[in-house]
Amino acid sequence: MTETPIAPLDDTPRFRYTAVLAGEIERAWQQQWADSGTFHVDNPVGSLAPADGSAVPADKMFVQDMFPYPSGEGLHVGHPLGYIATDVYARYYRMTGRNVLHALGFDAFGLPAEQYAIQTGTHPRTRTEANIVNFRRQLGRLGLGHDSRRSFATTDVDYYKWTQWIFLQIFNAWFDTDQNRARPIRELIAEFEAGTRQVGDGRSWADLDAGARADLVDAHRLVYLADSVVNWCPGLGTVLANEEVTADGRSERGNFPVFRKRLRQWMMRITAYSDRLLEDLDVLDWPDKVKTMQRNWIGRSTGAEVQFSTAAGDIEVFTTRPDTLFGATYMVLAPEHDLVDRLVASAWPDGTDARWTFGAATPAEAVAAYRAGIAAKSDLERQENKTKTGVFLGAYATNPANGQQVPVFIADYVLAGYGTGAIMAVPSGDQRDWDFATEFGLPIVEVVAGGDVTVEAYSGDGTMVNSGFLDGMDVATAKQAMTERLVADGRGRARVEYKLRDWLFARQRYWGEPFPVVYDSEGRAHGLPEGMLPVELPDVPDYSPVSFDPDDAGSEPSPPLGKVTDWVNVDLDLGDGLKPYTRDTNVMPQWAGSSWYELRYTDPYNSEALCAKENEAYWMGPRPAEHGPDDPGGVDLYVGGVEHAVLHLLYSRFWHKVLYDLGHVSSREPYRRLVNQGYIQAFAYTDSRGSYVPAAEVIERDGKFVWPGPDGETEVNQEFGKIGKSLKNSVSPDEICDNYGADTLRVYEMSMGPLEASRPWATKDVVGAYRFLQRVWRLVVDENTGETLATEDALDDDTLRLLHRTIAGTADDYASLRNNTAAAKLIEYTNHLTKQSVTARAALEPLVLMVAPLAPHLAEELWKRLGHEGSLAHGPFPLADERYLVEDTVEYPVQVNGKVRGRVTVPADAPADAVEAAALAEEKVVAFLDGRTPKKVIVVAGRLVNVVV
């Protein structure tokens, strides 16, 4: 919408707080902060420790934002919301004497810069660094109190050296299930050598040759290579993690089709930490919504592992309903299951139902045709297909509950990446199984009474029927009894299963961290020694991976780094002489650099370690005295979007726990407290074709919206939602800073509502924050002369009480991130001072200090004009006097038969009989009673008087 910017008129008083003056003040104080290192914060040890050797303050506060990706579009007004909120929080605690660490880096690896490089031939680093310069300029205008010395980008070689180092720590570790923690791989080897850990298969470590030993060790690593079914996106030329695929089976970035494909890929064994990732959610101060999302993503469920025997070996399934085993009338494997090719019969058994054959002459032909037919389907499409399809393998399995032979099928609704990739099908208890059985004419056996399985599956509680020794039991009892029978028969065991899959940790792109891994002539992977780090990303002649038709499911990835042959092929001495090796040509996913960056903020110049233990312990170590005995440690406040709940936040927790297990950090969680900020949204406008038009040019007229386009005025439709360049409703913070000043933008965004709530942007409302700051300015500065107005007058009682209520209220609000209510209290107090023409220093100085977290530039300038030298950034924040927080008098509404007829004010400590007497003497109450004697008078202390007549 078209708005008129605030600009000084010719008759504007010379010293009025205008956008021009605000800009001058802001630039001056930002320079002063930079020159003085105002926001530089000391570490206990290292290059950022106090030069005089003094100790750092015991009270600290580590505040962190989810750092931005430096896109080419720059910032719009929605982006700074969280950054301003954390700055207010950090400034408040800094003013209370805390040693506050607040810094901001950039998550700079990723697809957008690479795509731009492909299109233009410009190196991604060139584009990324230019974007970072612009981001720093835009964020710098906001007056954010960051320690600029601690800023970095994940693309900095000195940074990703330590990303590679962490990868090697995880690669060279294994998870000891007995101790429930990661341990160095050398300790596993030592146990094998000593014979305290069994190799398996009846062999000893001494029986194994070098290759077999390496294979055994590699199978235990927390990072491993696996031939697994992955999400292949031909349109992006790379594989994707499950978390990067949308619910409808497309890539989050680019919206390309994603296909399931078997490839050899790096995986991280995050599943080993499933229980700890779940359990430690209970000790985190995080939003319930995020905790629920992580719990659902990890998806812990209890049940039984069951083995169905076949001629080709056991088929293992996991079921949460072992009680229904007598109702398992067939089995289904994922088409990609390892056993499929071994189970396929050479010919159809006699009497095979034609519906089971897929129209093929042999089971092998049917399997091949079926696999080809589903190759282009996403996981979601496979699971949501209303028409059930499948192929009989010509093989049977033995149901361990009753010994019956059940046919084995493959079907697309069973996925290789979930559970064991095989199910026991109980059509009476699962609707998908029921649909499949109905489609293929398979038996449906009722095993839990309570429904009509001829109509649909029944999954509720009831009494067991048609279930042999389980008959008559309830479901819970039957689950336990069947599990015990399976254990006794050697055909199963109780088990916990998770939805969480291991983390696919490789991308066939260019702009990412290279793997610190090489392969020998036999194709075996070797982690590089730490002394060979960093492995720097080389320049390539062409940044693009071999791209494919987005629908070409049969395509194969070809990473750009494979083109740099003189980088790929190297001669190295890894401890056994100089030998030829080849480098891994994949790069790490975009989540790698953001999985540990909180640690680097604590020690950004350390060249010997990712951070000194003393610095990590100071900034992130557990503080049970402050946070309770179960405090996991971590960053004190982390603010960012809820969209990262099961991506960045889960991955960073996993990495941090591995580092904790290996003794590199003292905190077992990276983020003690998390707050998800809401979104700033705005109106957008579309013409009759659905095309967006510039929102700033739209005019509202007679309840309609028109756009004065090149062909004349056009009526447009209004919609509400995200802010973005593509929606043509983006408002730059530069524009608001130019027209009102950065402090006005800060106050406006913090005043819009609770931080966690989404809120609508309205440029026309910014003027309210602007006028508030003008009123604060006028209380201290004469607009005509520029003189400071502060006097040494004493404060009246009403002002004193309001002052101290405001101090107490804003302090509590700032500490609780309720910046909107803090602003409201400051506006109320400012209005009182303005209305009462209060110019007393005793009223103005606390106001300036309280305003400082919200509007720091204005506050600094006023503090200086009030005669103070130096910055107020380190306070002190005013303290409330408890004496003025207690009211001397109390106002009681007086009700007569339930309706308020008058009000009386009495001393706060007045006894009930005195309150009653005052109420009965109130003029309006006396008139209403008109001589009648009350039957009863009820005094509710501090609240009301009720007279019953």
Curated annotation (Swiss-Prot):
It comes from Mycolicibacterium gilvum (strain PYR-GCK). GO terms for cellular component: cytosol. A motif ('HIGH' region) lies at residues 68-79. It comes from the Bacteria. This is Leucine--tRNA ligase. Residues 540-562 are annotated as: Disordered. Belongs to the class-I aminoacyl-tRNA synthetase family. Disulfide bonds: none annotated. It catalyses: tRNA(Leu) + L-leucine + ATP = L-leucyl-tRNA(Leu) + AMP + diphosphate. Its EC number is 6.1.1.4. GO terms for molecular function: aminoacyl-tRNA deacylase activity; ATP binding; leucine-tRNA ligase activity. The keyword Ligase applies. One of its GO terms (biological process) is leucyl-tRNA aminoacylation. Keywords: Aminoacyl-tRNA synthetase, ATP-binding, Cytoplasm, Ligase, Nucleotide-binding, Protein biosynthesis. It is found in: Cytoplasm. A motif ('KMSKS' region) lies at residues 722-726. InterPro entries: aa-tRNA-synth_I_CS, Leu-tRNA-ligase, Leu_tRNA-synth_edit, M/V/L/I-tRNA-synth_anticd-bd, Methionyl/Leucyl_tRNA_Synth, Rossmann-like_a/b/a_fold, tRNAsynth_Ia_anticodon-bd, Val/Leu/Ile-tRNA-synth_edit. ATP binds at residue 725.
